Design a protein with these regions (language model features):
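Ser/Thr-rich, Pro/Gly/Ala-heavy low-complexity intrinsically disordered linkers and tails
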Residues: 1-39
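Cell wall/extracellular polymer interaction/catalysis modules
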Residues: 36-161, 167-170, 183-187, 195, ...
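Short, solvent-exposed secondary-structure boundary/capping segments
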Residues: 169-179
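Acidic/histidine-rich helix-loop elements
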Residues: 190
Length: 244
């Protein structure tokens, strides 16, 4: 699907930040922005402690992992959380190495909301929520929409991203190539830990926390702006921790 660039960014393509269009699809804008979390951001342990101490209400169960096991999603105040693995999602603009993904799709679910065209999975950290069967946006009744900001927690690290893609069926635990790279780093010695074919992170090692409600959602040109996602996510995470 082809979308026209916003008029501002056509004129300022060489300096997209001048019109609030950081992270233009196909550019290198924002590639490393998620690796720097601002001062005052909650730690990974603080978020995990909140998950552990919350009497979460199950909102959807029966999701599967690549390996054995069943996963449920829980609501806790202004957040929804789940534990899963991280398979690498390469849907969206097919730039290398995502153009080699045999399961890759030419667009993400957020494409129709993205004013400058689809997102690039090698540039934008995002995560995926499955639709179940029959497929439906069941998550909307729990304050989640495409563009919602969330925290992804693994190995003492927290990185923020948006909900940008849906998965058909019941398998859970996917995030973009860019999100995987924030945790595992770039290819080294000819080996890519985030290869869309056999990379990613082992089952159940990841905690995903999605912050609900309109204030915690990226819309319009914000969809491409990972620095903005971090800002929204840090504020939402601190507010969530203050609820109890």
């Amino acid at each position: 699907m082809t979308h026209a660039l916003c008029a501002c960014c056509v004129a300022l393509l060489a300096a997209p930040s001048a019109c609030g269009c950081d992270g233009i699809p196909g550019s290198d804008a924002g590639r490393d922005s998620g690796s720097v979390v601002p001062m005052g951001a909650p730690s990974a342990q603080a978020l995990l402690d909140e998950v552990a101490g919350c009497a979460g209400v199950e909102i959807k169960g029966g999701f599967g992992l690549d390996g054995a096991g069943s996963v449920s999603m829980f609501a806790c105040g202004s957040a929804v959380y789940w534990n899963a693995d991280m398979d690498v999602d390469c849907d969206g603009i097919p730039t290398p190495p995502c153009d080699t993904d045999p399961a890759g799709q030419p667009q993400t679910s957020i494409v129709d909301l993205a004013p400058m065209g689809d997102v690039d999975p090698t540039l934008l950290p995002y995560f995926v929520i499955p639709l179940g069967t029959p497929e439906s946006p069941w998550y909307a009744t729990h304050g989640i929409e495409l563009g919602q900001v969330g925290a992804v927690i693994y190995d003492g690290q927290v990185h923020y991203g948006i909900f940008a893609d849906e998965a058909g069926g019941w398998f859970i635990g996917e995030a973009s190539y860019a999100m995987c790279q924030l945790f595992l780093g770039p290819p080294t010695g000819g080996s890519d830990p985030c290869s869309p074919i056999d990379g990613g992170i082992d089952p159940s090692a990841i905690t995903y926390v999605t912050f609900t409600g309109a204030p915690n959602r990226a819309t319009g040109n914000e969809i491409y702006d990972h620095a903005r996602h971090v800002e929204i996510g840090v504020d939402a995470a601190n507010a969530w921790l203050a609820e109890r």
